[in-house]
């Protein structure tokens, strides 16, 4: 988080040209890194998006010195490749870029998805095709306004999706129109001004292109001064004399006049005007920087930083049982929250988002969200244990509500002493935790002496907490059982879990009687903690030198041990010895063991499938792999950096191991191939259909070596799941008007064999939702389509989040694990009508609402699969080749 809110007062574009733009002579507007197999050396939409975001982030850092650290100097970044790791290490410290890179990945994947999703890839308004320049501009500025609305409503996931769609259209303008051919050297001055008419547009009767029978068409454009764009495909049909988009996938380019004018890539087979690709990329980058800067100006620095997660800090999310017996637990939550707020206030680690959801049978909620720590503390302080006490409670419903409002990559803490009354939600909540990539930790005070607090209507099952264990396992979290007198001490893990720790993989992953748990420590790890909880008789920890330490409290040869009932925490002395460590535990049951550490080296990962039948080749993003599909795993290593010692060797990762969950059996090893320069940390692996043939959860472990050849071992923070079918749920651009009836589109496909499926729909809050598809019988490689209608009542609150869930599960004779699709929407009040006035040279652009159109905003497989591909393609320039253009006062 940035230290203060600084009013925006940026100079105009001509006043702030800090660095010279420099692109290589062979540098696309293809979607993502997979596109480069077809057109090597091209600049993708992801490149442009990420580069623009880094430019604006650097400018923000230069203007606001970091708290407690030396200010950044522009000269330190001149002539170097601009990397998020370097930028964030200079501002916040090493290992602080993970959240930013994840947020930027969301924007980039939403951008790339516009070329793949069925209702956006062929819409000319979303790509500035077919001379629909006015309509395209309306959709562009509408998406930017929706980005602002969603960001102010604290729905940053939706804001990033709308921002990605806006940037895609903006970048396409410079590749699909003839703006570059007209000799223009700057972005279009009116494209982000909805009140300014676009001038000199070609009309229907104006011929724009001549016939070209070659792949490369440098002279097919008729030399006039009117603005035009190419037609793609057959809808709408290309009028006589008009330009085509052109390229391998464009059926209109075979009709006279043949050829086309797109500048998407360096390949003449895809881009007839490939020779102008570099100029188009320069202008698209400039325009993207302007769009990011516009959002910064409209939102202010703090909200803009939250939009892109320009912070190493996590969010703080509590789900609290408020039944009468929960007084101690509620007080423990208050103490930890207060401690966190006070300890981190004004620092980079101050939480950026606060979520609070109470529950008390028979109800749950409402959800409280804020970015203000004082408001959160005030709301939390008003919560007290209420009457009642029946076991069980509506815990999973409350957790589902918290997941809906908690940002990705966050920790959620559940305080309760009751089992779930809504256990039927277990699988759905498991999937939602993986879709949101949130880790859930349950703090359960199971105190049998507390009979006066909990009225028990029946003998309680010893398995009643199994749903919590399932959700914790799926999310990478824990279930920690404790007692009243220890809850305040055990709750201290709230703060420790939010300290950007990584969880070290154990072999085996669960305690096996008589067998030690083994984990590896490398030179990049520090502040190692071991947590052990359960009915423990004894344990010991042994370092690589054979030195061991038992369960005795206090200081020991390896570190310091604290005990709170049946919960132990061992904090190892720094620096820890590198090599193989062991933990031996003797217990009556299956104890929980977790080893965590701080490190600058971590990784993000995404899944996708190669696509070759859209407007461009590329990678179709998936949240989870689908059984039977050849899938690409894309890994983005964070914390590599290059600024401190540019000449030093970088860590190298060679392969990834897939393990079954929870037993830990190895399913396979897959080699990793580097993508682009090693300092980018981009790796890819091909997961075969054989490896992904069975629907099941699995974990990912990254294996490699450090610069000295010592073993590196990192694990993904939570498991992934192979889902049995592909489930896509599409809707409007993400915004709902009160009183409207909104169509949604559903597609389900099987790639692993016949499937007999029942489909169920849910919506939160309880709006009316109808569907014309309740069952589906699918053969191999067969799809089914359905339509849903969501009715938004007049009473729907503006800025409220709506989540639609579709579940596809096997019938009784065909027990297939369920697959879930999630669609997030936002209720938004209509924007006031703008006055049609001409802006002065010193005013900011005004974002107005475009007419909503039916276009998908998310793709899901057991979750929303806008979350697939990681960072873009090979680097195309150095920071000596980056433009910082932050002023928008003249817009």
UniProtKB/Swiss-Prot annotation:
Glycans are attached at residue 55. InterPro entries: GBD_Hemicentin/VWA7, HMCN1-like_VWA, VWA7, VWA7_N, vWFA_dom_sf. Residues 237-272 are annotated as: Disordered. Residues 313-506 form the VWFA domain. The keyword Transmembrane does not apply. Keywords: Glycoprotein, Secreted, Signal. Residues 1-28 form the signal peptide. One of its GO terms (cellular component) is extracellular region. Expressed at low level in different cell lines. It comes from the Eukaryota. The keyword Transmembrane helix does not apply. It is found in: Secreted. Found in the major hispocompatibility complex class III region. May be implicated in susceptibility to lung tumors. This is von Willebrand factor A domain-containing protein 7. It comes from Homo sapiens. The gene is VWA7.
């Amino acid at each position: 988080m940035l230290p203060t809110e600084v009013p925006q007062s940026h100079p105009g574009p001509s006043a702030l040209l800090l660095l010279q733009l420099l692109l290589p002579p062979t540098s696309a507007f293809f979607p993502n890194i997979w596109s480069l197999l077809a057109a090597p050396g091209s600049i993708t939409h992801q490149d442009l998006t990420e580069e623009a975001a880094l430019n604006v982030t650097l400018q923000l850092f230069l203007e606001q010195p970091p708290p407690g650290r030396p200010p950044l100097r522009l000269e330190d970044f001149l002539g170097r490749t601009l990397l998020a790791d370097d930028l964030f290490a200079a501002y916040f410290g090493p290992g602080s870029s993970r959240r930013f890179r994840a947020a930027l990945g969301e924007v980039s994947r939403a951008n790339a998805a516009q070329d793949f999703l069925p209702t956006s890839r062929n819409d000319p308004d979303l790509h500035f095709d077919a001379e629909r320049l006015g309509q395209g501009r309306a959709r562009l500025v509408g998406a930017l306004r929706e980005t602002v609305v969603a960001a102010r409503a604290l729905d940053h996931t939706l804001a990033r999706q709308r921002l990605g769609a806006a940037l895609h259209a903006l970048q396409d303008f410079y590749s699909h129109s003839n703006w570059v051919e007209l000799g223009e050297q700057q972005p279009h001055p009116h494209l982000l001004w909805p009140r300014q008419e676009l001038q000199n547009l070609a009309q229907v009767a104006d011929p724009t292109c001549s016939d070209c029978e070659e792949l490369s068409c440098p002279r097919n454009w008729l030399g006039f001064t009117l603005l035009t764009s190419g037609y793609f495909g057959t809808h709408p049909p290309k009028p006589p004399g008009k330009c085509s988009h052109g390229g391998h996938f464009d059926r209109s380019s075979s009709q006279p006049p043949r050829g086309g004018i797109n500048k998407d890539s360096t390949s003449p087979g895809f881009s007839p005007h490939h020779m102008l690709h570099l100029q188009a990329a320069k202008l698209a980058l400039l325009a993207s920087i302007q769009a990011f800067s516009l959002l910064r100006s409209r939102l202010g620095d703090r909200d803009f930083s939250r939009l892109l997660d320009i912070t190493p800090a996590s969010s703080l999310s509590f789900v609290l049982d408020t039944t009468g017996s929960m007084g101690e637990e509620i007080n423990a939550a208050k103490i930890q929250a207060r401690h966190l707020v006070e300890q981190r206030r004004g620092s980079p680690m101050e939480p950026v988002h606060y979520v609070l959801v109470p529950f008390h049978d028979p109800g749950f909620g409402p959800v409280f969200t804020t970015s203000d720590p004082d408001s959160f503390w005030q709301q939390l302080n008003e919560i007290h244990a209420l009457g009642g006490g029946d076991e069980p409670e509506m815990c999973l419903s409350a957790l589902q509500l918290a997941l809906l409002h908690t940002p990705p990559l966050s920790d959620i803490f559940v305080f309760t002493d009751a089992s779930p009354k809504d256990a039927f939600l277990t699988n759905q909540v498991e999937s939602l935790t993986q879709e949101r990539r949130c880790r859930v930790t349950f703090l359960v005070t199971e105190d049998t002496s507390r009979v006066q607090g909990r009225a028990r209507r029946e003998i309680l099952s010893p398995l009643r907490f199994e749903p919590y264990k399932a959700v914790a396992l799926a999310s990478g979290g824990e279930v920690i059982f404790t007692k009243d007198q220890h809850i305040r001490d055990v709750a201290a893990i709230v703060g420790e879990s939010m300290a950007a720790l990584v969880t070290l993989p154990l072999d085996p992953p669960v305690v096996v009687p008589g067998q030690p748990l083994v984990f590896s420590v490398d030179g990049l790890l520090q502040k190692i903690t071991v947590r052990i909880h359960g009915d423990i008789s004894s344990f010991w920890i042994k370092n690589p030198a054979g030195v061991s330490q038992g369960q005795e409290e206090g200081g020991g040869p390896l570190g310091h041990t604290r005990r709170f009932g049946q919960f132990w925490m061992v904090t190892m002395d720094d620096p820890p010895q590198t090599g193989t460590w062991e933990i031996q535990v003797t217990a009556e049951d299956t104890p929980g063991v977790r080893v965590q550490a701080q490190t600058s080296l971590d990784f993000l990962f995404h899944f996708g499938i190669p696509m070759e039948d859209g407007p461009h080749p590329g990678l179709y993003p998936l949240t989870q792999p689908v059984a039977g599909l050849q899938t690409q795993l894309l890994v983005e290593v964070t914390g590599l950096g290059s600024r401190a010692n540019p000449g030093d060797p970088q860590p190298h990762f060679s392969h990834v191991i897939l393990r079954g969950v929870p037993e830990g059996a190895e399913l396979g090893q897959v080699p990793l191939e580097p993508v682009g320069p090693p300092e980018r940390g981009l790796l890819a692996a091909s997961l075969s259909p054989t490896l992904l043939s069975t629907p099941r959860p699995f974990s990912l472990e990254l294996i490699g070596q450090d610069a000295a050849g010592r073993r590196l071992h990192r694990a993904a923070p939570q498991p992934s799941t192979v889902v049995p079918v592909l489930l896509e749920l599409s809707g409007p651009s993400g915004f709902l008007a009160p009183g409207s009836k909104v169509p949604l589109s559903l597609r389900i496909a099987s790639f692993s064999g016949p499937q007999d499926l029942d489909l169920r729909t849910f919506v939160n809050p309880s709006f009316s939702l109808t569907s014309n598809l309740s069952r589906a019988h699918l053969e191999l490689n067969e799809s089914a389509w359905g339509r849903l209608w969501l009715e938004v009542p007049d009473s729907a609150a503006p800025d409220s989040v709506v989540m639609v869930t579709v579940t596809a599960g096997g019938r009784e004779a065909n027990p297939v694990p369920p697959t879930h699709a999630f669609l997030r929407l936002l209720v938004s009040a209509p924007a006031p009508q703008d006055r049609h006035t001409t802006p002065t040279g010193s005013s900011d652009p005004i974002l107005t609402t475009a007419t909503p159109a039916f276009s998908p905003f998310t793709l899901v497989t057991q979750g929303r699969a806008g979350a697939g591909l990681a960072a873009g393609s090979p680097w195309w320039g150095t920071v000596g080749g980056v433009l910082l253009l932050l002023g928008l006062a003249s817009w």
